[in-house]
Amino acid sequence: MAGPDIQLITPDSADDWQETRLILRDYANSLDVDLDFQGFEDELTGLPGAYAPPGGLMLLALVDGAVAGCGAFRPLLESDYANACEMKRLFVRPAFRRFGLGRVLAQALMDRATEAGYSAMLLDTLDDMEAARGLYESLGFVEVPPFYFNPIPGAHYLKAELGAFRPSYFG
């Protein structure tokens, strides 16, 4: 019996961007934190914004044609890390968890950021996101000092060198 059909796409139509806004709202609602400090509403209104190529990227994960997950990266222009980007908005809808989509999305973002010429990827995550922190560690991310202000208690800041060896999800 074949598994689900998983595709990663880059939104390129008005309908795709509307689906992106919907899943990003699901992401924000799943956090139980206020993302106003990140300008979240402006981000949604201005999509693709900083996620536009060539410096950024937004991916949607489709499972049997349904939008199941998302993830993005954008240039990180103001940090202590040269030639870095930031992974943002990695999320898989609960009904689609356990397919390995988080890993597929994260690894695809890292690969595409490497292809875009970045040498490092940074991100922040929260204490209660234990599964996500384990995923990031397995992909080579390590804790670093804060690279921007996050007022949410328990924020962790992580960095991975791009182009470094990472175990492949596909074997």
What is the role of each PLM region?
Residues 8-88, 93-94, 106-108, 112, ...:
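Acetyl-CoA-dependent GNAT
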Residues 7, 119-139, 143-171:
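C-terminal "cap" of GNAT-fold acetyltransferases
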Residues 106, 113-124:
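Conserved GNAT acetyl-CoA-binding A-motif
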Residues 99, 103, 107:
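Residues forming the Rossmann-fold NAD(P)(H) cofactor-binding site
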Residues 93-99, 127-128:
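Active-site acidic-Proline motif in GNAT/NAT acetyltransferases
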Residues 14-17, 99, 130:
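Loop/helix-junction capping segments adjacent to catalytic residues or to phosphate/diphosphate-binding pockets
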